[in-house]
Structure formats: structure tokens, C-alpha cells
């Protein structure tokens, strides 16, 4: 059975391309009798004709973003503001300090002292060097 007309009509009614129209193989006889747009709409509602979901493009295939220095506009901190940098650094330091305490490298008293002056360290490696273990 040639259902090309019905498929084209369904695509037009649904406002999609031909590739997104799928006719249920079990209900071919019903679809072949459809002639009008109203018939096609009824078949879409009943599920004899299915409109497939639009296919996306995976992140890997997307065009790569141009993030090089030549594309950047704005100052030094417009891409990564000072506050974001601070949050990233302080969270890393706190995480490392907690790990040191759990591993027994520092005791609770040392932990409190270091936590209070955590802002004076620039990096996790500097904190490790200060503890010296």
C-alpha cells in the first residue's frame, strides 16, 4: 500500500518534515482510508500516525565555542569575577583542611587556628606546605 499522500498530509498538518512522521504498521488499513486533513488529525490523536520527537545535536558535534583571548571583551575579572575566584579558592582550602583533620594530620585545636587564618593562603599547596606534613 502506498501511503505517501497520507504521510505528506500528516507532515503538513503537524508542521513537521516527512522524516518525523511515522505510521503504525498495525493500523496501515486505517491510514490508507484517510483522505482529508480532518481524517489525518483524527489518526494523529488516536496514535495511528505518530509524530516523532525532534532530534537534537550532541554536545560533541556542536560547533566549538571560540573562547580564546582574542574573543574576550571586558576586563580581567569579567570572565571569572573576583568573588567567584574567592569562593572557588576558599572552598578548596576548607575541603583540604577538613581532609587533613579527618586523616589525623592536624588536631582540632590546629584545625580551628588554621581555619581562622585560611584567607591568608593562596592555594591548597601553600596550606600543605605550612602544615608541613
From Swiss-Prot:
Coiled coil: none annotated. Residues 60-83 have a biased composition (Basic residues). GO terms for cellular component: cytosolic large ribosomal subunit. Residues 55-83 are annotated as: Disordered. It comes from the Archaea. Keywords: Ribonucleoprotein, Ribosomal protein, RNA-binding, rRNA-binding. GO terms for molecular function: large ribosomal subunit rRNA binding; RNA binding; structural constituent of ribosome. One of its GO terms (biological process) is translation. NCBIfam families: PRK08570.1 (NF006343). Belongs to the eukaryotic ribosomal protein eL19 family. Part of the 50S ribosomal subunit. Binds to the 23S rRNA. This is Large ribosomal subunit protein eL19. It comes from Korarchaeum cryptofilum (strain OPF8).
Amino acid at each position: 500500500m502506498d501511503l505517501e499522500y497520507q504521510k505528506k498530509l500528516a507532515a503538513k498538518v503537524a508542521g513537521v518534515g516527512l522524516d518525523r512522521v511515522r505510521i503504525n504498521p498495525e493500523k496501515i488499513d486505517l491510514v490508507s482510508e484517510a483522505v482529508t486533513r480532518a481524517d489525518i488529525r483524527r489518526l494523529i490523536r488516536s496514535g495511528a500516525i505518530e509524530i516523532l520527537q525532534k532530534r537534537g545535536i550532541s554536545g560533541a558535534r556542536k560547533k566549538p565555542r571560540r573562547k580564546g583571548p582574542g574573543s574576550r571583551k571586558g576586563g580581567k575579572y569579567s570572565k571569572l569575577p573576583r568573588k567567584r575566584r574567592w569562593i572557588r579558592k576558599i572552598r578548596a582550602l576548607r575541603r583540604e583542611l577538613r581532609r587533613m583533620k579527618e586523616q589525623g594530620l592536624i588536631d582540632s585545636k590546629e584545625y580551628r587556628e588554621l581555619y581562622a587564618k585560611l584567607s591568608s593562603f593562596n592555594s591548597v599547596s601553600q596550606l600543605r606546605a605550612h602544615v608541613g606534613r
